[in-house]
């Protein structure tokens, strides 16, 4: 790769990712209200929405689990730009559907389109963008570059959420569809291929008719099965070759498992307990996105050379856990806003893990390695709804098993709940104080 194309390629990549993420994120604050209005109008609680959301996450996760390594591996052979075209184009379809109408029937059409397009789109654009950056940046600068890429996505998140805060729901989906189209056109016109033409093994689009496209090794209908088996073997081989890669995969799985459960349940929890709506969701996301942007664009390039990726990974995981804990014990509507500020540090893990992974493989395996980590995150997204969707519905229902003060999803706290909770904690403190003489006498 010639150095003269490096900066230009990354600049166009950053613009492409900004436009794409803007189109994806602008609809996030309104989807809860749209889903509830289409399926359970006039209600703040809806089991159908929770289970449909979980089902969509499971289907998307299972599909992405198989697709991500395949997309990454194909991009190693046929180029990042070529593979980016498919998910970015498919992303337009569900957004255009909701821009047309948001009735119950259209919502189900959107649901089906979104579920099956997300199998290819969910995570693949970021996976290919990370591989693109790895093609153009030296190992020593990859963590900072990945952080900048994540910061660009966070900036898009903030800008999109600000727009959603002031736009109507209908206009929001129209803007999203327009930006999705614009991002695809910009990518095709301006983004240069990061892999030199002489290193690409084959072109996906060819003038000659291929008997078995992209699957030259195994003839006949056994090709698809054989390729899936081969991808699994390649994943296992990469894991065995590198202990750090295996460790990052495990950390990625468990952190994604927690994050997926939090994102799947927190919006319904906040809506049921504090009656959050589109505007409050947008405010919360703006705080989270702004903190993430500042962290990735300003703190990450400074902290990586001083602390290295491993320490930053530990710091990020600690603050991510603290954010989840603070949110789950929220006793007032302002607590989620304070928890969102933790994104200053909780956003570190993804960039750090991707950087560590990129250093464990050769340049011709970057797409495959990033695809493996993305597929492991997808596996966590499959497992998470199986546990969190029933639990969320159970604790949001009238038959919740218990109502532990401040540590419950129960939407109908008793009257004067804040006073009751304060008295509860005061009683705990007093009990501990009274126990001190007894503990000293018996055990010290």
Residues covered by each model-derived region:
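Juxtamembrane intracellular "pre-TM" segments in multi-pass secondary transporters
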Residues: 1-10, 193-251, 272-273
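Helix-to-loop junctions at the C-terminal end of transmembrane segments
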Residues: 66-80, 295-309, 392
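C-terminal ends and interior cores of transmembrane alpha-helices
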Residues: 85, 89-105, 318-331
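Glycine-rich segments within core transmembrane alpha-helices of 12-TM secondary carriers
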Residues: 141-165, 180, 376-387
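A membrane-interface helix-boundary motif in multi-pass transporters
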Residues: 166-180, 390-416
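Short amphipathic helix-loop junctions that connect adjacent transmembrane helices
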Residues: 30-50, 264-281
